[in-house]
Amino acid sequence: VVKAVHIDAGARPEEAIRETRWLQSLADEGGYPHAIVGFAALNDPDVERILAQHVESPNVRGIRHIINWHPNPRYTYTPRNLLEDDTFARGYALLAKYGLSFDMQIYPNQMVQAYALAKAHPDIPVILNHTGMPVDRDAAGDAQWKSGMELLATLPHVAVKISGLGFIDRNWTTDSMRPLVLETIERFGTKRCAFASDFPTDKLFNTYAH
């Protein structure tokens, strides 16, 4: 490993700054991680104070706020779609002021709205998480994922992490994931794709070596 990026590990809102400061202390002592993506609830009216505290740590590069919303309660992470929330949109816009990127974790049913938000803020780099998380594996779900990925790929400031395959298919194999991986690279190109481990979460579904 040459360099490492730490993505927020699910810290509660009141612990997010403490997590970032702890990670920065590790980097100061041992060099790792080289970059930090912290957590901030962008729909918090007080989010600017949180962002200002995050960037006090020099290795902070971005923010992740998981906003997966799905009409099926089995899949949804949030009680409502925050891409329809004006307070969230205002919080998102503040990322540019602090020079931060956004790790966007959504489902394909949110991609059209995500496209509109990202297009309105070309100065905020976006990293789409977990291959776009196409959890609906039927024909309609596949078509929605493909069209959403194609739309997001038209924005040059949007990149994608190929990861989280266990979220998509808990019994995944190389053959079952190959089309998703290749289609993602085809749409975004090699310069806007990165492979990410998503460990330890993906350890639930397979080994790191696999």
Regions found by a protein language model. Give the residues of each.
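Alpha-helical scaffolding within the catalytic cores
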Residues: 1, 47-49, 111-112, 140-149
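Catalytic domains of carbohydrate-active enzymes, especially glycoside hydrolases
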Residues: 1-7
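Active-site metal-binding loops of divalent metal-dependent hydrolases
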Residues: 9, 131, 197-199
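Active-site gating/metal-coordination segments in enzymes
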Residues: 14-109, 116, 159-168, 175
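Proline-centered flexible-loop/turn and helix-kink motifs
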Residues: 31, 122-123, 156, 189
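Non-cysteine beta-strand/loop elements that form the S-adenosyl-L-methionine
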Residues: 60-68, 125-131, 158-162, 190-195
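Active-site cradle of extracellular carbohydrate-active enzymes
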Residues: 114-118, 132
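H/E-rich (His + Asp/Glu) clusters that bind or coordinate divalent metals
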Residues: 135-210
